[in-house]
């Protein structure tokens, strides 16, 4: 009798789902089989969360998902990804580092250390999020913040982090930078040879959402753009569907950004997002591209 490893079983399920999708055009948008959540929050965290990362991985695996990326605004998650993989085999789990104040802000040493964590599952660098200058000023908060640009120039430590992303083939995310900052960062990242750049929740960014024209420029420069649950509204879905039609699905990644106690579970939110976009005219093949193939390419899963 032939025995298959858990990862091979998942790949077989993905292939069977793809075959079903070829026969039933809408099938891939009605299921999470093979999907990847590039932006998943869970406990342990200093912020209240709906579910811990072990149960999150179990739920994602039960739904047939291929991978999740664990995000925490204030703690690196590469080591957490290693532990979750041991506890929940059969789904690929990745982590990263968000360059907020608890890791020293934009700290090249912290990024370098993350790349050394056993397993090599630290794949993503988020430039400052909650502590970004753009969000702190936009929220009119008092207190320190982490800057990425000053007087129109990218700061030296940010240039170093971009260089590390290129060196270690990491996914560089813009975090909660402003649209203007993000475009500067994307151009510099491409100049330094970063292969994988993602604009974090491009249309709902607390540091300032991108306009359609700014998203077009980001895509032209070589970045992909993330769309998230948010939570969903009819207006948001209409605007996202219009952006997908204008730029093309090849430029987008669909993530949940879920884990908040008041919001749905990640799996439920992703399905609602897929169905909502389809109701606004986005095709099943585009959902497949944005939820499966594009994030897999960012993570290097199909090499």
Region annotations inferred by a language model:
Residues 10-23:
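Bacterial N-terminal signal peptides
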Residues 27, 53-56, 78-83, 89, ...:
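Histidine/acidic residue-rich metal-binding segments in metalloenzymes
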Residues 34-40, 68-70, 94-97, 125-127, ...:
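Hydrophobic faces of well-ordered beta-strands that scaffold small-molecule active sites
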Residues 1-8:
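N-terminal secretory signal peptides that target proteins for export/translocation
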Residues 38-48, 130-153:
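Glycine-rich phosphate-binding "P-loop"
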Residues 228, 249-266:
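Short acidic/histidine-rich active-site segments
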Residues 28-90:
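An N-terminally biased module of ancient metal coordination in phosphate/nucleic-acid-related enzymes
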Residues 269-303:
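Mid-to-C-terminal alpha-helical segments outside catalytic/metal-binding sites
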């Amino acid at each position: 009798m032939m025995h298959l490893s858990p990862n091979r079983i998942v790949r077989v399920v993905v292939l069977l789902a793809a075959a079903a999708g070829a026969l039933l055009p809408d099938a891939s948008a009605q299921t999470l089989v093979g999907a990847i959540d590039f932006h998943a929050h869970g406990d342990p965290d200093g912020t209240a969360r709906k579910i811990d990362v072990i149960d999150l991985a179990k739920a994602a695996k039960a739904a047939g998902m291929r991978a999740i990326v664990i995000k925490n605004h204030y703690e690196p998650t590469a080591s957490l990804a290693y532990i979750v993989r041991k506890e929940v085999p059969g789904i690929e789990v990745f982590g990263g580092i968000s360059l907020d104040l608890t890791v020293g802000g934009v700290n090249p040493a912290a990024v370098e250390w993350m790349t050394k964590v056993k397993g090599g599952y630290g794949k993503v660098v988020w430039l400052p999020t909650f502590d970004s200058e753009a969000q702190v000023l936009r929220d009119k908060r008092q207190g320190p913040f982490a800057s990425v640009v000053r007087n129109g120039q990218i700061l030296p430590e940010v240039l170093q982090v971009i260089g590390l992303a290129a060196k270690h083939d990491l996914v560089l995310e813009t975090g909660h930078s402003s649209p203007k900052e993000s475009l500067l960062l994307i151009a510099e990242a491409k100049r330094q040879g970063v292969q994988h750049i993602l604009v974090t929740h491009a249309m709902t960014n607390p540091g300032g959402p991108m306009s359609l024209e700014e998203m077009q420029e980001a895509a032209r420069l070589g970045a992909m753009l993330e769309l998230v649950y948010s939570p969903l509204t009819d207006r948001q879905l209409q605007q996202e569907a219009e952006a997908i039609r204008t730029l093309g699905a090849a430029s987008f990644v669909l993530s949940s950004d879920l884990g908040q106690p008041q919001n749905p579970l990640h799996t439920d939110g992703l399905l609602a997002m897929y169905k909502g976009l389809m109701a606004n005219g986005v095709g099943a093949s585009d959902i497949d591209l944005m939820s499966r193939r594009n994030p897999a390419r960012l993570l290097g899963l199909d090499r």
